[in-house]
Amino acid sequence: MKRIKLFAAACLLTLISVSCTQYNFEDSGEANGNHNCTMWEYFSKDAYNWKLLQEMITRAGLEDVFKGTSSYGKDITYFGATSNSIRAYLFENGMKTVDEIPVDDCKAFVLNGLLTKRKMLDDFKEGRKSSDPNVTIGTGGETFEMASGKQFWVYTFRDTYSGVPGAGPKRIYVTSLDTSKESAVASSNIQTLTGVVHSMDYDFRLRDF
């Protein structure tokens, strides 16, 4: 009986470990730890979340940006779309692989998420979404020009938790002034030697930027 209990406990721990590793971007808040490697190498280590983004980056000819060898240097911030978002784009457009996406589109999608300065979660200003659905920019926050030339209004906000306003984790919200769509960051402060990654929610869509 004791052996059975120990075996069951081991199985449970294994399942929890796999779940936390595979779906670590579903929960809001900060990602764990620093990564002593380039951003490109970090993406390579987590194929589940970043494989399709890497394929898009390669197709766009922008690997050097994430390896820290481009003119942007080694202090970039990247709002990264996970493979789930890219997979949804392929499905919605009747495509099966990233190679079917036009090169110019790949380049635009990649550069839309690139901010050419290092910004951690606490570096972004607090703000609040406008109560008027026709007004794109709310109060606070800050507007940034991305490497693609698009402008994003970015702010942080603490959500409600257990019915208490402001008791939840601080999250980053990104609003494209082109599309007027707001997107949430799932995990922030993923630090690498060539910049910081803020991973977008799994329900983020490439056209939202």
Model-predicted regions and their roles:
Residues 1-8:
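Bacterial N-terminal signal peptides that target proteins for export
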Residues 15-19:
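C-terminal motif of bacterial Sec signal peptides marking the signal peptidase cleavage site
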Residues 20-209:
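Mature, structured domains of secreted/extracytosolic soluble proteins
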